[in-house]
Amino acid sequence: MPRFPDQLLYIGGRYVPARGGHTFEVVNPATGEVLANVHNADADDLDAAVDSAKAGQRHWAALTVVERSRILLRAVALLRERNDALAELETLNTGKPLSETRSVDIVTGADVLEYYAGVAQALQGVQVPLREGSFFYTRHEPLGVVGAIGAWNYPIQIALWKAAPALAAGNAMIFKPSEVTPLTALKLAEIFTEAGLPDGVFNVLPGDGASVGHALTEHPEIEKISFTGGTATGRKVMASASSSSLKDVTMELGGKSPLIVCADADLDLAADIAMMANFYSSGQVCTNGTRVFVPRALRTAFEARLLARVQRIHIGDPLDERTTFGPMVSAAHMQRVLEHIEQGKAEGARLLCGGERLRDGALAQGCYVAPTIFSDCTDVMTIVREEIFGPVLSLLTYDDEDEAITRANATSYGLAAGVVTPDLSRAHRLIHRLEAGICWINTWGESPAPMPVGGYKQSGVGRENGLATLQAYTRTKSVQVELERYASVF
């Protein structure tokens, strides 16, 4: 018997059953417990959601910026008021420790919504005189109905990252959460309605890519798609969006990000950063710094510091406040991570710790993979080249700065990068040469609301967060005004 009742679609400000009658199970990855049967949307449901969104968007866009901002700020207050309950639901669905979801997931999502509610007034056009009797002005107009597809690792945070700028700019959004972790996106829809968002302005369609995701990307009345997920899927989404109606797209995709530890680095600080860049959220973070470059002479000392810190990881029940490391999000994903680990062993990487599924006691019921560190890695190894999206750190050695930069950039990805050094001149010199969209110096992982987030190369297109993203949910209209009598040449 599932813990929760059946979860329906959210269309037009209320819950409705899927027209096709199909459902899928959502499972707690820490225990294997079935949490709920979720209705699976299809193309017919999408058409209903689009009709609802079009009607709601006209009302929403007609409100003043101040009126829209007040509603969004009421949603912020409700999110913060219900932080603990939402965090517990997120933990049950994702397996992430409650200590994380309470302090990060809802908090940072609400921060982004508050940010866009505050800066929406910045959508101002320009007025430019052309001559004494003529000028033009520009205005930013909402796109209309936009679509978004979320990832499974930060379900409610990603939903808010995508909804906040879209709604602040006057659009309606149809959001498809990951079929693995759809529960909190539905709660977010409830909160938006309670806050006063017009019906249809935020619709949620759970379901898989084949039944509703593809239909969303190719629907002719959806003006933009924002997608977070793997690069291979991102290519398909982009192709579908462009071939159907030349939709604008934002893509936040995969990464294999480098963390460069410089020869003058504080090794304790560097080890702390490397641990957070690899084992936070059990390694299921797109920006993880999984390729850790350390000077050859410091390898042994650095390995010792990493191993000491692995001993401090508290693996267990995600609902236990002491837990700092939970399971993989699903059995299928756990298997993919374990296959990469076995490939690392087969290709000659030296296993320092972990490298196996955890089966002790209650952990056997869940999808737990031990924190894993490989040393003596080379650039051609599969674990160094491919995104694993799990708790697997690859340690590589280098001899000089130029070598480190060249090898760090030798990837098709370009999402994130980091440098650890007390010499800020060196830090900036290295960062400016690294081919990545998000870079950190002597820290890792923070993405505040005003900071644009996105990748180079095959790690993405466009940006999430920041002022430019608000503008990306609008189109610019140019209007020329002639004050004097128009002079025709005919």
Swiss-Prot record:
Binding-site residues for NAD(+), renumbered to this chain: 150-152, 176-179, 230-233, 254, 286, 387
GO terms of molecular function: betaine-aldehyde dehydrogenase (NAD+) activity; metal ion binding
Active site residues according to the UniProt entry: 162, 252, 286, 464
Annotated site, Seems to be a necessary countercharge to the potassium cations, chain positions: 248
Pathway noted in the entry: Amine and polyamine biosynthesis; betaine biosynthesis via choline pathway; betaine from betaine aldehyde: step 1/1
Binding site for K(+) 1: 93, 180
Alphabetic keyword roster: Metal-binding, NAD, NADP, Oxidation, Oxidoreductase, Potassium
Primary enzyme class: oxidoreductase
Annotated residues for binding of K(+) 2: 246, 457, 460
Keyword hit for rRNA processing: no
Cofactor(s) the protein needs: K(+)
The EC number(s) this enzyme carries: 1.2.1.8
Stored NCBIfam families: BADH, PRK13252.1
Family: Belongs to the aldehyde dehydrogenase family.
Described purpose of this protein according to its UniProt entry: Involved in the biosynthesis of the osmoprotectant glycine betaine. Catalyzes the irreversible oxidation of betaine aldehyde to the corresponding acid.
Protein name: Betaine aldehyde dehydrogenase
Taxonomic source organism: Xanthomonas campestris pv. campestris (strain B100)
